[in-house]
């Protein structure tokens, strides 16, 4: 039996793709260890995967909310969040090293977590990349200017990993590319959503999205009754962006009032602190953790933050989107949805108001039939790719 380890940091959306991959690997005879923040133990173990706690015992989504709440600029917010996560990765290297020991393969997550440790241990690696913008165009002819600017950026990106390399007496690298697998980089995105860049090296493979149907889920009686009692509701699912550092009644009011004024029924996920003493009208209800594979099929469209996982779920389950990106990478995923005409143009978080939300709901209604048709068509195509199965097939080819 082949033994593999995956270590990842971040919110649930950063962990979920690796749960899907781990489950498929286990089905194919692998022994898998998935390491992450201690707060994700139940999520991972409930999926039948061996869990290893990595890093401090913190609520990562609340920590991310505190950082986000202090900065309004999406690029700066993303940079501060990345610095926070990189600091945890550096401080957790001993735990990552222990999780990697004795394994036949290390699957290096999108934060490059485990890459240095695998190199020290002499264990082969496979990479996973969620943002295609992070993949170098190695086959593109480079001008002198390209080389100079690229070298400067690469040096900055490599800094956190060189700090880890120093712990093990390793020489610094000039680029994070030097610690990536030279054989396989898995990109869990559909070729029907993003075209393969002709300047990528052959090792970079668009597998299709990784997902799980979660067919065993049964909603509670209250949620089932609400779904059955009227028109399909709007789903408000801001993911980790609705985890509040403090009560955000003003933001929730914007959405609730916009739903009232547009005559929209709605299901609202998140806003736990605000919801404790918040009274919703009968046309709306709050729900906790419900699988997107079930919830999104019940909705008319989704208003969401465009994290990787939620964006993928809207495409997999064939539902249009109103994107509300909060940080820079989310803006990129929002543009992917808009480019294939399954979403309105993004409504940036800094521009949120009752009026702008109403305008986006009206924009969605005006083009809904076309967007819904496109979403369902792409969903059918995605299902022909068998993304997570393709990923495991490629891994098998590599190590057998």
Where are these regions (language model features)?
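A donor-sugar binding/catalytic signature common to diverse glycosyltransferases
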Residues: 105-109, 287-336
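Conserved nucleotide-sugar phosphate-binding/catalytic loop shared by glycosyltransferases and other
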Residues: 33-78
């Amino acid at each position: 039996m082949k033994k593999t380890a995956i270590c990842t940091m971040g919110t649930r959306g950063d962990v979920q793709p690796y749960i899907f991959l781990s489950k498929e690997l286990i089905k194919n005879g692998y022994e898998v260890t998935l390491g992450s923040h201690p707060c994700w133990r139940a999520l991972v173990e409930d999926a039948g995967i061996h869990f290893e706690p990595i890093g401090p015992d913190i609520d990562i989504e609340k920590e991310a909310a505190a950082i986000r709440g202090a900065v309004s600029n999406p690029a700066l917010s993303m940079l501060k969040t990345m610095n926070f996560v990189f600091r945890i990765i550096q401080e957790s290297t001993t735990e990552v090293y222990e999780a990697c020991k004795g394994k036949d393969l290390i699957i290096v997550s999108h934060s490059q977590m485990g890459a240095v440790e695998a190199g020290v241990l002499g264990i082969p690696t496979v990479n996973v990349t969620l943002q295609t913008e992070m993949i170098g165009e190695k086959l593109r002819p480079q001008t002198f200017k390209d080389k100079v600017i690229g070298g400067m950026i690469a040096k900055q990106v490599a800094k956190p990993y060189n700090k880890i390399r120093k712990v093990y007496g390793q020489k610094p690298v000039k680029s994070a590319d030097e610690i990536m697998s030279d054989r396989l980089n898995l990109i869990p995105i559909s070729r029907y959503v993003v075209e393969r860049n002709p300047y990528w090296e052959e090792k970079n493979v668009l597998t299709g999205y990784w997902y799980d149907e979660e067919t065993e889920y049964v909603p509670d009686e209250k949620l089932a009754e609400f779904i059955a009692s009227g028109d399909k509701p709007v789903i408000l699912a801001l993911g980790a962006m609705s985890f509040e550092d403090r009560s955000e009644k003003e933001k929730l009011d914007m959405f609730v009032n916009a739903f009232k004024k547009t005559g929209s029924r709605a299901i609202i996920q998140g806003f736990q602190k605000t919801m404790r003493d918040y009274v919703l009208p009968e046309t709306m209800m709050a729900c906790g953790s419900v699988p997107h594979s079930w919830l999104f099929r019940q909705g008319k469209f989704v208003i969401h933050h465009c994290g990787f996982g939620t964006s993928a779920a809207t495409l997999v389950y064939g539902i249009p989107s109103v994107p509300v990106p909060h940080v820079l990478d989310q803006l990129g995923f929002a543009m992917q949805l808009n480019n294939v005409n399954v979403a309105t143009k993004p409504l940036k978080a800094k521009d949120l108001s009752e009026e702008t939300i109403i305008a986006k709901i009206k924009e969605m209604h005006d083009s809904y039939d076309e967007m819904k048709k496109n979403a369902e068509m792409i969903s059918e195509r995605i299902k022909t790719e068998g993304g997570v199965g393709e990923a495991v097939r490629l891994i098998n080819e590599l190590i057998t």
